[in-house]
Amino acid sequence: MGIKRYVANKDATITNAFKLDLSTRATGSNMGEADVTEIFSIYAQATTSSIEKSRALYEFPITDITTDRTSGDIPASGSVDFYLKLYNAKHGLSLPRQATYVIQPISQDWDEGEGLDMESYLDSGSCSWKMRNLENSWTTAGGSFLDRNTNTGIVFDKTL
């Protein structure tokens, strides 16, 4: 059987990093229309003990995947592998030699939003570190995820 490609329906970056003033967190910022998603962790940006993170959210066409499985276009569960391919966008910052990424299914629906600003975090609305859409907050700030211990979740280390 050949390779079947599924592309994300929507994506967004959310963060709790500090804005340029280093006193206000960007927890209300939205980066759903940016041309890339960012994954980062910054230690001691504002204080010696502060930790700032971002999360890249992706929604894939699960209904299409289920339909393809039912129709026999892809093999039954347990006999097919799915791969998530992400690429590094060219930038002037250094990459970590080693990083650990946790990939988990999101437990609540969310809106992509129209934010573009990934520097000053001036765009708000839709999903953010605090909100999953304009009206509803995440159950847990930073996104609500299914429990990795009871659901499919992946942790992998990347070494350059």
Predicted regions and their residues:
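Secreted, disulfide-rich extracellular signaling modules
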Residues: 1-160
